[in-house]
A protein has these predicted regions:
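Acidic catalytic loop of the alpha/beta-hydrolase fold
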Residues: 214-219, 245-246
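Primarily recognizes the serine-hydrolase "nucleophile elbow" in alpha/beta-hydrolase
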Residues: 126-133, 139-184
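Short alpha-helix in the alpha/beta-hydrolase fold that links the catalytic acid
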Residues: 88, 197, 206, 220-229
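An N-terminal hydrophobic leader/cap segment in hydrolases
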Residues: 18-51, 273-275
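Short beta-strand/loop motif that positions the catalytic acidic residue
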Residues: 203-205, 210-212, 216
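Post-His helix in hydrolase/transferase enzymes
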Residues: 248-262
Length: 276
């Protein structure tokens, strides 16, 4: 009996030790291979290396347009790398936006291993690059995050008030979205990874656009609505259709005009639903 109990305790202990790694693999899906570059789709760009405050070199692409109406700091999702977002870069160009898109540590050509705090430091370094190296005024910046990047963008915007914030297909927090998929997992499993987007948006007063698909199969539509309801400042909700990863393409006829309209009136304070 004692031996059996000892074996059970050992197995449980090993499971507890293994859980952080399992959770990390649930959150991060990095791809190292850069499959294609902006020049492949006719976009001029500069390959940039930015050093974070903890000494990690991260890779980024600076993709300018002539006479930009604003500049985007784009925080991508948890999968792939910068080369997976060329369609998004094309959207930026059509909207007249210069952009810096960067890879989190452990993604693409960026050094290191991904972690929650690490991704925040990566976004901070990208912000510093735009405002110090490129000399772009904060009020001319749009911090834009998609999926996991929504939490990173919200946290960056909470620390650095800027012109606009766009949060697309994002969750309220990792524990809450994980519970929607794996209800039996206890909350403490995610103690190391919170990405508490809702807490960050509570601190934001700048005009913010929330974009979410009512057909999102990964992050429930309700998460986008909760983020919208949490915001205290000027805010707009843009409802689109389509899957989590393809919704912006499937809803392009609503997506681009909705973003354009938001940018045009960024100084306004209306709370509006642009589309259902």
């Amino acid at each position: 009996m004692f031996e059996r109990r000892r074996i059970i305790l050992i197995v449980l202990g090993l499971l507890v030790l293994a859980l952080p790694g399992c959770v990390a693999s649930y959150i991060y899906y990095p791809e190292l291979d850069i499959r294609i570059t902006p020049s492949s789709v006719g976009l001029a760009y500069t390959d940039v290396t930015v050093e974070t405050s903890d000494g990690v070199n991260i890779n980024a692409w600076w993709v300018p347009v002539k006479n930009p109406r604003a500049t985007v700091l784009f925080c991508h999702g948890n999968g792939g790398n910068v080369s997976y977002y060329l369609e998004t870069l094309k959207v930026f160009k059509r909207l007249g936006l210069s952009a810096l898109i960067f890879d989190y540590r452990g993604y693409g050509r960026s050094q290191g291993k991904p972690s929650e705090q690490g991704t925040y430091l990566d976004a901070e370094a990208a912000w510093q690059y735009l405002t110090h190296e490129r000399k772009i005024a904060p009020q001319q910046l749009i911090i834009w995050g998609r999926s996991l990047g929504g939490a990173i963008a919200a946290r960056t915007a909470a620390r650095h008030p800027t012109g606009l914030l766009i949060i697309e297909s994002a969750f309220t927090s990792v524990p809450e979205v994980a519970h929607a998929h794996i209800a039996w997992l206890p909350a403490w499993v995610f103690a190391e990874y919170r990405y508490d987007t809702r807490r960050y948006v509570e601190q934001i007063t700048m005009p913010t656009l929330i974009i979410h698909s009512s057909e999102d199969e990964i992050i429930p539509f309700a998460h986008g609505r909760k983020l919208f309801e949490t915001l205290e400042g000027p805010k707009v909700f843009l409802a689109i259709k389509g899957s989590h990863n393809q919704g912006f393409i499937d809803s392009l006829s609503v997506y681009e005009p909705g973003i354009d309209a938001f940018i045009r009136r960024y100084a306004g304070g209306t709370n509006e639903v642009l589309a259902e």
